[in-house]
Amino acid sequence: MKNILSRRDFLKLSGVGLGVLAFNPFKPERSPLALPQFPVSERLGRVFSKIDVHTEPSFNAPSVKVLYDDEVVVWQQEVITRGALDMNIINQRWVRTPDGYIYAPQLQPVKNVPNTPVTALPSGQLGFWAEVTVPYVDMRLEGAAASPHIKTLLEGNFPVRLYYSQVVWIDQIAQDGGVIFYRFNENGGRPAGITGGSYGDLLWGEASAFRLLTPEDVAPISPDVDPTSKKVVVDRTENYQTLSCYEGSEEVYFCRVSTGQYRDSYGNPVTEYLTPLGEHTTWRKSISIHMSGGTTGTGYDTPAVSWSTLFSGDGYAIHAAFWHNNFGVPRSHGCVNCLPEDAKWIFRWATPQNTLEQGDAVAEGLTNGTHVIVQELTI
């Protein structure tokens, strides 16, 4: 099987000869697929949406500038609100940047770590899993858009991007002008008949943005511990959202999370998004999955959600979230959102066990997974 496409084949597939710039709104002075020149710093932050930069870590402090979607800033230090705490919000964290302070929930913690691309698929394999290790990478669609997510972006003249920490399945490699590109295939990397909820979109991106996953990325944590002694406890209390992993009575991991929302966008109490209380069992794990649901206006459609550990047949899962940084505060439609590094640890620790060859793993029997308890404190 030929793994490297010719330049002619690549241009034909990606639509360059058909005026690809007409539907990808990138700056004309650079290639649509070229990685941007991100700030130089060990720690960076990606802006989720329009935000103000303040002179002090407080919403009452003057604004010195405004930043917009996907701008990247140097992340110098995380601090808490200066002066009296703002009792209207739960999260009091701010990030100090060279230009001032930004409210931490509005910045994704990212790094810029380009990689040396491979030029061929591993021998005997149909593809490989890879993680985005730069703040974002612009993607070019092959063929017609299938998912609502991509259709909406293109209709609004917005770029199609993957973001830091997303994990995707790469099934083709191409070279163009001395630059190597990978193709992300939403349907790849899973056993036959399992699509991971995807619509089957095919997207090309600059290869240096992606790090190949290794067996160590999915290696089990504490494999010698009796699986029946492992337990996950999720606290969905509205102002105290946490997750703990136990081996017997010993807590071995702790992190902040975001469970299902208690209120709608107008502040009205709602119940349809709450993470279900009670005892559950992990039954499926997926290295990367396409998540969608809800209705028009309140629905969601998100590709490449990494490190998903499903604990309910209704689709509730513990998984990474790259679209917000407001952990400790309810934010989801019922799932348990984690920082990517937290979701990955839980994924490796809980059962069933995965391998790179087995992107999706399903527990044998309904009770053979890891015990999950969702509770709510009453004060």
Kindly label every feature range from the protein language model.
Residues 49-58, 140-152:
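Short, structured beta-strand/loop micro-motifs enriched in basic residues and often containing a Trp
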Residues 173-277:
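Cell wall/extracellular polymer interaction/catalysis modules
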Residues 57-69, 149-162:
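SH3/SH3-like (including bacterial SH3b) beta-barrel domains
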Residues 24-59, 72:
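C-terminal segment of N-terminal export signals and the immediately downstream linker at the start
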Residues 227, 264-265, 272-277, 284, ...:
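Exported/periplasmic cell-wall-interacting domains
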Residues 67-109, 159-208:
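SH3/SH3-like beta-barrel superfamily modules
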Residues 31-38, 93-134, 185-227:
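Boundary regions of SH3-family modules and the immediately adjacent low-complexity/disordered segments
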Residues 2-3, 9-30:
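N-terminal export signals
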